[in-house]
């Protein structure tokens, strides 16, 4: 009997050791959306579920992310009840070189969305005298880029060289004001763009101002807190935009208001988008977020009001 107990204890210990470096996290959100477009009202309920599994062995990490969303967010209705494998990548070190390879989507900037997930990606990076150097490749898109980043006299700088364009990102604190700049210089004619954001807190209220300027052939598609999802705003080539955002905490709630004004390149196509959001953690472990968005376009037949109520949980 003692021998059996000893064997069971050893087996349990070995099993625990085998899975000690594996973690599972996830989140789910459910959204109720009411849309009023020129008097035509629609209601919908959608959900999004994500599950991430991370395994570690020494300096090597494997990340696998799965999702199951409803059909309203997918092109393929069959995915409504199918778990879809999304990000899968491995990170490790070989000497002084950090290696990341696999499938993932990039990071959005104020100018461009990089949410398309591609496979066969790889990044080789290392540090050299305070400067981070990264060589990145995308097998699916047949593209490579080189990025240099570091700190220059208190200014965080990143310069990215792509096959058909160069990108520059700067951020610094100037007299208590957070300043960021993003610029794209493209080989194609009339395809440059630049944006900046100024942000400062006044008596518990964070105030930010953002401005983006695009050449006649560049379409802003960024997705950041400054403007929200520019693609959802349906900005066209050559459209410029500015935004003011206010954010504060009030009675346990996070409250924000964002006012976006789009100066369209086409005549009589300007529009404003005003968004108000209240977020509150609930006792049951969920977070409730209510967002009201009012879009006022040139011409009374182009206006739209959207009320979105989201219930989300992370685990």
Label each region the model flagged.
Residues 1-315:
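Outer-membrane beta-barrel proteins
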């Amino acid at each position: 009997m003692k021998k059996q107990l000893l064997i069971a204890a050893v087996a349990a210990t070995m099993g625990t050791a085998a899975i000690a470096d594996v973690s599972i996290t996830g989140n789910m959100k459910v959204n109720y959306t009411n849309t009023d477009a020129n008097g035509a009202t629609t209601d919908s309920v959608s959900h999004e579920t994500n599950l991430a599994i991370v395994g570690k062995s020494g300096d090597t990490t494997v990340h696998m992310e799965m999702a199951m969303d409803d059909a309203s967010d997918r092109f393929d209705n069959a995915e409504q009840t199918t778990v879809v494998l999304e990000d899968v990548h491995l990170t490790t070190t070989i000497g002084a070189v950090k290696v990341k390879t696999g499938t993932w989507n990039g990071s959005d900037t104020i100018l461009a969305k990089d949410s398309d997930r591609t496979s066969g990606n790889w990044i080789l990076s290392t540090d050299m005298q305070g400067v981070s150097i990264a060589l990145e490749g995308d097998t699916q898109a047949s593209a490579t880029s080189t990025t240099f980043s570091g700190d220059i006299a208190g200014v965080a700088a990143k310069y990215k060289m792509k096959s058909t364009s160069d990108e520059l990102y700067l951020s610094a604190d100037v007299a208590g004001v957070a300043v960021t700049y993003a610029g794209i210089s493209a080989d194609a004619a009339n395809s440059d763009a630049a944006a900046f954001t100024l942000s400062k807190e006044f008596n518990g209220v964070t105030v930010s101002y953002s401005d983006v300027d695009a050449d006649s052939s560049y379409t802003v598609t960024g997705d950041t807190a400054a403007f929200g999802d520019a693609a959802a705003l349906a900005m066209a080539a050559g459209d410029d935009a500015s935004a003011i955002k206010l954010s504060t905490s009030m009675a346990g709630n996070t409250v924000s208001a964002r006012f976006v004004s789009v100066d369209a390149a086409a005549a009589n196509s300007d529009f404003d988008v005003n968004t108000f959001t209240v977020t509150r953690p609930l006792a049951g472990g969920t977070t409730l977020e209510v967002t009201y968005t009012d879009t006022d376009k040139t011409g009374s037949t182009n206006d739209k009001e959207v009320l979105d109520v989201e219930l989300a949980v992370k685990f």
